[in-house]
């Protein structure tokens, strides 16, 4: 029979799994308290980094519908519950792991899909959501300005062609009054 404290911990962890966009399991063996504090700061407000008990976390993950991480709950485990941009948090974890080789990224879950350590590192290599959105907006803006210049060029090109036609062969065709007005207006 679980104790009330353990039941409360499982409920809290289950809520963390359900309310986060992503969760990354890490092994923190050999890291000092100061290094863990630095890691928490680097993750920022969009992620909560918690040292957890494997059994309770495994139960909470299963209750939240996440069973793909079961094999990774071994050894000293901590979980980064990510509520913001998963790319930024993955970058923070990757960069911290480069500087502190004792931090090992084990696995993770993103929107219910299990991720390997390599997939998390690939996620960290992506540009942030804001950068990708700004690139997309820039691409749309560029296409709109190209279309606008094309539409502006069509009438002026027509008028230039009509002027050339009128000046090159006055004997072949006599422009109508409306065509003359259009040519003189340009």
Swiss-Prot record:
Record GO terms (molecular function): large ribosomal subunit rRNA binding; structural constituent of ribosome
Coiled coil: none
GO CC aspect terms: large ribosomal subunit
Segment forming the signal sequence: none
One Pfam family named in its UniProt record: Ribosomal_L10
GO terms of biological process kind: translation
Keyword line: Ribonucleoprotein, Ribosomal protein, RNA-binding, rRNA-binding
InterPro entries, per the entry: Ribosomal_uL10, Ribosomal_uL10-like_sf, Ribosomal_uL10_bac, Ribosomal_uL10_bac_type, Ribosomal_uL10_CS_bac
Oligomer and partners: Part of the ribosomal stalk of the 50S ribosomal subunit. The N-terminus interacts with L11 and the large rRNA to form the base of the stalk. The C-terminus forms an elongated spine to which L12 dimers bind in a sequential fashion forming a multimeric L10(L12)X complex.
Role of this protein: Forms part of the ribosomal stalk, playing a central role in the interaction of the ribosome with GTP-bound translation factors.
Family per similarity comment: Belongs to the universal ribosomal protein uL10 family.
Record protein name field: Large ribosomal subunit protein uL10
């Amino acid at each position: 029979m679980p104790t009330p404290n353990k039941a409360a911990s499982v409920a809290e962890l289950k809520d963390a799994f359900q309310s986060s966009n992503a969760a990354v399991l890490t092994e923190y063996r050999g890291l000092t308290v100061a290094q863990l504090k630095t890691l928490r700061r680097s993750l920022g407000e969009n992620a909560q980094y918690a040292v957890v008990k494997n059994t309770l976390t495994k139960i909470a993950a299963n209750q939240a519908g996440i069973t793909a991480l079961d094999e990774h709950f071994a050894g000293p485990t901590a979980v980064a519950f990510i509520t913001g941009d998963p790319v930024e948090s993955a970058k923070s974890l990757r960069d911290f792991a480069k500087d502190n080789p004792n931090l090992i990224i084990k696995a993770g879950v993103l929107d219910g899909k299990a991720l390997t350590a390599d997939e998390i590192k690939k996620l960290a290599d992506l540009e942030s959501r804001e950068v990708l959105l700004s690139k997309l907006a820039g691409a749309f803006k560029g296409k709109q300005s190209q279309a606008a210049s094309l539409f502006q060029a069509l009438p002026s090109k027509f008028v230039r062609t009509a002027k050339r036609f009128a000046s090159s062969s006055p004997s072949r065709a006599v422009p109508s009054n409306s065509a003359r007005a259009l040519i003189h207006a340009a």
